[in-house]
Curated annotation (Swiss-Prot):
Substrate binds at residues 9, 41, 73, 87. InterPro entries: Cyt_trans-like, PPAT, Rossmann-like_a/b/a_fold. It catalyses: (R)-4'-phosphopantetheine + ATP + H(+) = 3'-dephospho-CoA + diphosphate. This is Phosphopantetheine adenylyltransferase. It comes from Caldicellulosiruptor bescii (strain ATCC BAA-1888 / DSM 6725 / KCTC 15123 / Z-1320) (Anaerocellum thermophilum). It is found in: Cytoplasm. One of its GO terms (molecular function) is ATP binding. Keywords: ATP-binding, Coenzyme A biosynthesis, Cytoplasm, Magnesium, Nucleotide-binding, Nucleotidyltransferase, Transferase. The keyword ATP-binding applies. The record marks 17 as: Transition state stabilizer. GO terms for biological process: coenzyme A biosynthetic process. Its cofactor is Mg(2+). Its EC number is 2.7.7.3. Pathway: Cofactor biosynthesis; coenzyme A biosynthesis; CoA from (R)-pantothenate: step 4/5.
Length: 167
């Protein structure tokens, strides 16, 4: 069985992420969307919320599983018996960092491969940070995040930014 892992913080999941997930799910027998607990970031959505949003977003894809993980990605890969990391690239600017990470993962575990997938050009500008920024200033995010979860994401972001402004 070919198992791929698509890691990220997904805070929140965007249409760009979904584009990569849908396309990668056609390549692998099983694709695990690995939601990272990143100690270097303070997420708006906690790990349970991010996992739940991704499960809702990907429920139409029977070979996709969503799991949380912390620690080294290669340790998670071993635990899941996966050999391929899937990384989405929006632009050339993403490549340098992702290339360095791929080389590091290869050094730590030589059996691990990384494949890079270019996002659809209509999402090349899109990031979770941009979704949060648009929401913060009251803009519409319905075309930026999966339709299924747009209202939940907007509600959470509105609440978060209202609380920040009150402080």
């Amino acid at each position: 069985m070919k198992i791929g892992v698509y890691p990220g913080s997904f805070d929140p999941v965007t249409n760009g992420h979904l584009d990569i997930i849908e396309r990668a799910s056609k390549i692998f027998d099983k694709l695990i969307v690995a939601v990272l607990v990143n100690p270097n970031k303070t997420p708006v959505f906690d790990i349970e919320e991010r996992v739940e949003l991704l499960k809702e977003t990907t429920e139409h894809l029977p070979n996709v599983e969503v799991k949380a993980f912390k620690g080294l990605l290669i340790d998670f890969m071993k635990q899941e018996n996966a050999k391929v990391i899937v990384k989405g690239l929006r632009a050339v600017s993403d490549f340098e960092y992702e290339f360095q990470m791929a080389l590091l993962n290869k050094k730590l575990e030589p059996s691990i491969e990384t494949i890079f997938m270019m996002t659809n050009s209509k999402y090349s500008y899109l990031s979770s940070s941009m979704v949060k920024e648009v929401a913060r200033f009251g803009g519409c995010i319905e075309d930026l995040v999966p339709e299924k979860i747009a209202k939940k994401v907007m509600k959470k972001l509105n609440k978060k930014y209202t609380e920040m402004e009150e402080k």
